[in-house]
């Protein structure tokens, strides 16, 4: 996968995008990450990238020309127009796991990181997606882009040591992940549930499903509305409701 990031602060990406899973993906050549400063594409000697809004208003807006020329340079380099150009915007659609899965199917993504008060509206005509990290405002789009890149890249084949890890993560199944334990079996009188140490894989799978349902029911009941429930899951959910009422 190739990812291009358009930003005014490329150095912000040097550390986070060179470590851990993303760093390893780049080392394995599973990910090509290019970060460009769209100030370099400004057409005036002062390299201005923002200006006052027509009609008045608070703050400065990002100009259309530098971002347009930066996108055109990417198109010329790759000999094709990127299929997904993502604008980081507080007014955009909230980012979620399903969106990360969609992005992971693409060969090329472009992220545009905003700054200042906002964008010249004409920039929006150049993008395919307007995405927000959540219902709050950050100084710029850089941190949001890093989060989305991380969530997307870890879904690529062979990026994680165990591909099953991405499939069983919280949100990937529509449910929050069940509790997990490692050695020792007893620590400060806190014991690992016996079912996990008895070697009965059928009982373990049932416990994991039930506890995944329980955690989702208690912490994010809204997620259950979009889960396609099997008869077994419905039965377990009723048991959970009765247990939690005691």
UniProtKB/Swiss-Prot annotation:
S-adenosyl-L-methionine binds at residues 114, 133-138. It comes from the Bacteria. Its EC number is 2.1.1.228. One of its GO terms (biological process) is tRNA N1-guanine methylation. The keyword Cytoplasm applies. It catalyses: guanosine(37) in tRNA + S-adenosyl-L-methionine = N(1)-methylguanosine(37) in tRNA + S-adenosyl-L-homocysteine + H(+). GO terms for molecular function: tRNA (guanine(37)-N1)-methyltransferase activity. Coiled coil: none annotated. Its main location: cytoplasm. InterPro entries: Alpha/beta_knot_MTases (IPR029028), tRNA_m1G_MeTrfase_C_sf (IPR023148), tRNA_m1G_MeTrfase_TrmD (IPR002649), tRNA_m1G_MTases_N (IPR029026), tRNA_MeTrfase_TRMD/TRM10 (IPR016009). Pfam families: tRNA_m1G_MT. Signal peptide: none annotated. The keyword Electron transport does not apply. GO terms for cellular component: cytosol. It is found in: Cytoplasm. Keywords: Cytoplasm, Methyltransferase, S-adenosyl-L-methionine, Transferase, tRNA processing. Specifically methylates guanosine-37 in various tRNAs. Homodimer. Belongs to the RNA methyltransferase TrmD family. PANTHER family: TRNA (GUANINE-N(1)-)-METHYLTRANSFERASE. This is tRNA (guanine-N(1)-)-methyltransferase. It comes from Enterococcus faecalis (strain ATCC 700802 / V583). The lineage of its organism: Bacteria, Bacillati, Bacillota, Bacilli, Lactobacillales.
């Amino acid at each position: 996968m190739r990812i291009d990031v358009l930003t005014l602060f490329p150095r912000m990406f040097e550390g986070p995008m060179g470590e851990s899973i993303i760093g390893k993906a780049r080392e394995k050549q599973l990910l090509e990450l290019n970060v460009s400063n769209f100030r370099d594409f400004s057409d005036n000697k002062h390299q201005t990238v923002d200006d006052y809004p027509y009609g008045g208003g608070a703050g400065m807006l990002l100009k259309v020309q530098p971002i347009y020329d930066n996108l055109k340079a990417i198109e010329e380099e790759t000999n094709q127009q990127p299929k997904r150009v993502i604008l980081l915007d507080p007014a955009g659609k909230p980012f979620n796991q399903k969106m990360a899965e969609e992005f992971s199917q693409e060969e090329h993504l472009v992220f545009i990181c905003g700054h200042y008060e906002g964008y010249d509206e004409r920039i929006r005509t150049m993008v395919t997606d307007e995405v927000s990290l959540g219902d709050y405002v950050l100084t710029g789009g850089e941190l949001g882009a890093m989060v989305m890149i991380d969530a997307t890249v870890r879904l690529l084949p062979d990026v994680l040591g165990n591909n099953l890890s991405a499939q069983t993560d919280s949100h990937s199944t529509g449910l929050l992940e069940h509790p997990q334990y490692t050695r020792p079996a007893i620590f400060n009188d806190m014991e690992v549930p016996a079912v996990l140490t008895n070697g009965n894989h059928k009982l373990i799978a049932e416990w994991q499903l039930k506890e995944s349902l329980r955690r989702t029911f208690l912490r994010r009941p809204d997620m259950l509305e979009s889960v396609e429930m099997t008869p077994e899951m419905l039965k377990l959910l009723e048991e959970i409701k009765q247990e939690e009422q005691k």
